[in-house]
Amino acid sequence: MASQLFRPLTPRLSSLTPVKPHFGHLQAGISVAIQRTDGRIHLAVVTEVRRDNAWVTVEWAEKGVKKGKKVALETIFLLNPALALAGPAAQGRASRSVSLAPPSVIGDQRTAARWAGKIPQRNETPSGDSLAVRVPSSPCLMTQRKSACLREIEKLQKQRERRRRLHREIRAQRARDADTGNAHYEIRRLIEECRRRLRGGRISGPEPRDGRRICVCVRKRPLNRQEATREDLDIVTIPSDNVVMVHESKQKVDLTRYLENQTFCFDHAFDDTASNELVYQFTDQPLVESIFRHGMATCFAYGQTGSGKTHTMGGGFSGRDQDCSKGIYAMVAQDVFLLLKTSAYEKLNLKVYGTFFEIYGGKVYDLLNWKKKLQVLEDGSQQIQVVGLQEQEVCCVEDMLNLVELGNSCRTSGQTSVNAHSSRSHAVFQIILKSRGKLHGKFSLVDLAGNERGADTAKANRKRQLEGAEINKSLLALKECIRALGQNKSHTPFRASKLTQVLRDSFIGQNSSTCMIATISPGMASCENTLNTLRYANRVKEITLNLRPRHRCLYPAEREMPRVLENHIRNSEMSLQGDEFIRIPCLQSEEEKETEGIKVLSSPLVDTTISWKEASQWPDNKIQDTSDEVNCNVDFCIAQLLSILEKKIDILTEIRRKLKLLQADIQKENRHGEVNGERSDLK
């Protein structure tokens, strides 16, 4: 029976004549193995070979239905590697390995089953009438040709894997170099890189201060024990003796952290290694001699609570005890008594008095008289007087220190979440010089209470919160006064609080000289408060003091200090290096010629020209050298140029005004001369 079934097959196979293959041995009419979409592999008959686009059309029967599909040439060669081999031997092997499906068996289920039985089967059996083909366990597959789209996808995948591998290496290197225990180790790394760049560039020193402007200095304290415990970062850098840079941490939309460096320029800047002696040398010591010449000097410390104001003014703490001999109070007293013994001031027969009072809750209390309540009033000459304030005469430095210790013991203080020894009041210590019972000079040392945020005192009791609100209210009033003075407004709200009333003469009083010490905290948690303090101090820097012309000799630029203070400065631990400036020759020669020509016509212009000569010393050599550096700090250069320009604009505006007045006077005199000449001609 089997011989009868396969009898027609032999002549049919023998009648096939070999045809010269195209695209290898692939041609129409042969059976090839194809793969279906569901993964099944079976035989199909090639009906058409498209040479133009390398496609092959195949057909097969399944459940009595003829089906067909188009298969790529690469796919045919992948499943039928023998078709691509060349040579007669390969052709013979191909004819043995590839079977042709007889057309007569298509449609007969039993014949198709027996035909399929002669062919080695694959694991998955095709359904219907389709024939299965065995794929060799280790076939000799051809390399499949890849399309351009597939090659581009593989290229992108390789690039993506290379980037990921590089990022993994970078993260591993950062983990090895950085302290992963700190949550802000990435910000620390950025700050260290910024500081390394700053060390490579040249930083210029402080510029000479104009005597009519408030001296503003900034002091940075070191990280305290509480900040070190929580591993807070130091975000404040002082690259030179008059520049402060704050590294503010920012975050992009993609959560990438970066630094925004904000630069401020002041008269002096002290880092966390500076001592109280160094701070005093460049802040209060130049003002001590002014009170011996009928001057009113003031120094006030401003800053966030816990930033070191009381430490600077009164001295350091050892537990709850304060060493008053290391503060600015004691240093001013020492220099006052030193100058009293000099020959220049000994003949004045001056007596020294001390007062100490505080402003707490909007009220004034005398710290040397059992905290007696005082009143701040204005007399007929519009001078602020503290009524009932007790003045105690002192004869030596030890007596002055006793007053300071007595006042500090009575001063209102408390403990907050930010500072264990927080001052809850504004303290004013005054050193008064009197000659024959009349006021000769006065030095006021003001230790302001620290401004507080509501978030810092949210867990405090009601008393502490009310104290913080009152402190912020008085400091806000002081800020509004400073803003009004900086904008030259007609009204300055000094009566808004007791603090501004007491400090009014320091800003607008005659013969006043003022110094501000802004203390800042270096911790990252205090970044917002630090920036507010620096902006506050930057606005104070623009205020011009009201000086009388007859007392201009009090603060000349080349004034020599007495030898006693000179030796004291020479013996200090360190000194700030001043800049060497150059003059502009063309401007100087022109101004000298103009001064000689108009000296008789306008005497006020001479003073303006002299001040312009002093101010025309531009530090262009320093700025040029800094800009020539490869790693120069652009923010620092811009801040320095803006600081220089702000100082020159006021002088140039005044010169222009005087020149216009002079021009009008000359034109007026010329018109009068012409009229007089015409009258003489008529006569």
UniProtKB/Swiss-Prot annotation:
One of its GO terms (biological process) is cell division. The modification Phosphothreonine is found at T125. Pfam families: KIF2A-like_1st, Kinesin. GO terms for cellular component: centrosome; cytoplasm; kinesin complex; kinetochore; microtubule; spindle. The keyword Mitochondrion does not apply. Residues 141-176, 640-672 form a coiled coil. Its main location: cytoplasm. Keywords: ATP-binding, Cell cycle, Cell division, Centromere, Chromosome, Coiled coil, Cytoplasm, Cytoskeleton, Kinetochore, Microtubule, Mitosis, Motor protein, Nucleotide-binding, Phosphoprotein. One of its GO terms (molecular function) is microtubule motor activity. The keyword Cytoplasm applies. InterPro entries: KIF2A-like_N, Kinesin-like_fam, Kinesin_motor_CS, Kinesin_motor_dom, Kinesin_motor_dom_sf, P-loop_NTPase. Phosphorylation at Thr-125 by PLK1 is required for activity in the correction of kinetochore-microtubules attachment errors, while phosphorylation at Ser-204 also by PLK1 is required for the kinetochore localization and activity in prometaphase. ATP binds at G303, Q304, T305, G306, S307, G308, K309, T310. The modification Phosphoserine is found at S204. It is found in: Cytoplasm, Cytoskeleton, Microtubule organizing center, Centrosome; Cytoplasm, Cytoskeleton, Spindle; Chromosome, Centromere, Kinetochore. Residues 213-543 form the Kinesin motor domain. Plus end-directed microtubule-dependent motor required for spindle assembly and chromosome movement during mitosis. Has microtubule depolymerization activity. Plays a role in chromosome congression. Belongs to the TRAFAC class myosin-kinesin ATPase superfamily. Kinesin family. MCAK/KIF2 subfamily. This is Kinesin-like protein KIF2B. It comes from Bos taurus (Bovine). The lineage of its organism: Eukaryota, Metazoa, Chordata, Craniata, Vertebrata. The gene is KIF2B.
